């Protein structure tokens, strides 16, 4: 394959049932540029990697942890633009066309997309709207909004901090402090509602808001993950 313009980096953990559908959806994206797909499995069993049908996909394993996995993917990426995609999120069909035209004409170092949730329920539409509005106001999109960055800039700032939570927020805050800008497209990624459905909608919303507030108040991600695990065990007991 010629030098790819884009590298789509997908950290996974036990996504064997979902991964081939995701890869198929990525192959349908509208683009005139070459792109590569890199799947990074955080499971020692490599169960997701074993079921991938597409032999064009770059498959690697790493230590568990989204930040560690994304950094591992970025370390082997060849594309000029890195797209960090969650396994339960789909890009809009014109995503790469939009990124290509925008990045080539502007001095922004990267960006993300508005949030969409694959559900007809009004509550999810409200969650998506508020999430998109928040990221436009504070310029800190979350990982489920398909963050993309120029590879040279990503390497320059040292990639993701390998912390257990809030790696996306920490990266965006670091970019803001450096004086660089990111752009958020009105085009929407579509993410699965599964985490809200599995954990309980109200619980998930309140837990996430609590974590965000505590993080912005100065608690470290390592303290937050202890809270997360304790709260999760309490809910399951």
Regions found by a protein language model. Name each.
Residues 1-3, 173-237:
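Hydrophobic helical membrane-anchoring modules
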Residues 1-25:
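N-proximal low-complexity "stem/linker" segments adjacent to membrane-targeting elements
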Residues 5-7, 36, 170:
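Cell-envelope/extracellular polymer assembly enzymes that use nucleotide-activated donors
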Residues 24-34:
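Short, acidic, metal-binding catalytic loop of nucleotide-sugar glycosyltransferases
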Residues 41-49, 89:
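A conserved acidic beta->alpha catalytic loop
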Residues 49-76:
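Conserved donor nucleotide-binding strand/loop of the catalytic core
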Residues 82:
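Short aromatic/hydrophobic "clamp" motif used to bind/position activated sugar donors
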Residues 94-123:
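Conserved donor NDP-sugar-binding/catalytic core segment of glycosyltransferases
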């Amino acid at each position: 394959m010629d030098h790819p313009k884009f590298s789509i980096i997908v950290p996974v953990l036990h996504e064997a049932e979902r991964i081939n559908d995701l890869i198929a959806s990525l192959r349908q994206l509208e683009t005139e540029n070459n792109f590569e797909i890199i799947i990074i499995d955080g499971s020692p069993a490599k169960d997701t990697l074993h079921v991938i049908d597409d032999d064009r996909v770059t498959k690697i394993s790493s230590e568990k942890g989204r930040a560690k996995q994304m950094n591992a993917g970025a370390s082997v990426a060849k594309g000029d633009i890195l797209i960090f995609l969650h396994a339960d999120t789909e890009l809009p069909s014109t995503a790469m066309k939009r990124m290509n035209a925008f990045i080539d004409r502007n001095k922004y170092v990267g960006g993300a997309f508005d949030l969409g949730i694959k559900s007809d329920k009004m509550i999810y539409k409200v969650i998506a709207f508020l999430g998109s509005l928040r990221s436009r106001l504070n310029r800190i999109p979350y990982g489920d909004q398909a963050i993309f960055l120029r590879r040279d800039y990503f390497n320059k700032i040292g990639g993701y901090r390998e912390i257990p939570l809030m790696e996306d927020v920490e990266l965006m805050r670091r970019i803001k402090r450096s004086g660089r800008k990111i752009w958020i497209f009105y085009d929407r990624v579509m993410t699965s509602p599964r985490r809200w459905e599995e954990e309980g909608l109200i619980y998930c919303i309140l837990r996430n808001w609590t974590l965000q507030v505590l993080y912005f108040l100065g608690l470290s991600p390592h303290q937050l993950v202890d809270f997360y695990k304790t709260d999760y065990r309490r809910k399951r007991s």
